[in-house]
Amino acid sequence: MNLDLRTVSAIYINLKKDVKKDFEMKRLMVDFGFKNVIRVEGNVIPDRHLAGCSLSHYNALHEIDPPFIIFEDDCVIKNNTPEIEIPDDADAVYLGVSSWGRMNAHSGPFVQYEKVDENLVRVYNMLGAHAILYLNQEYASMCSRIAQNGYDIADHQDIGFAEIQRYFNVYALNDPLFYQTSSNGTNEPLTSYPTQELMQPHRSFWKPTALY
């Protein structure tokens, strides 16, 4: 189906202290042409930075009903192409990509994907959460539960996001509309990055089968 992203509510997460990023995100929203923009204040939790990040995503996921886009405030426009074609069965579409994926309890260059066409891939374990289009409540609710757990254990919520992609219809634009200034491997087409499979997890992640 054809979707004009400018008609979708755009939510961006921004810390109160990051005034410059707030200004830059407001400018991004205008430049892209979003009609409904919502700022969600990010959470700072002393000594639990990752918990604050996960809580911020949790709050953003509860702001309105899907469809909506959640942005982190270090996004930059790469391709100003508001109208996109997406599959009718899509639960979510990553408008930004990452060259890193999650496999066998490791994060690295392990993104597994299936090419749909030149512009779209289905992803199964891709990390990153800087620009995601959420299309239905079931998927958004699952991501909300993951973000809640990320807050509870003070860990990256995007690890959980990556690990459930295989159970949903999650796609990514091969050539991203947005990239992340704080991360490498987010500004080129996903298929241009080398990828591999991690088949032998590090022993430190193994659990004993028996205790003696």
Please identify what each model-predicted range represents.
Residues 1-71, 75-212:
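An acidic/histidine-cluster motif and surrounding catalytic segment
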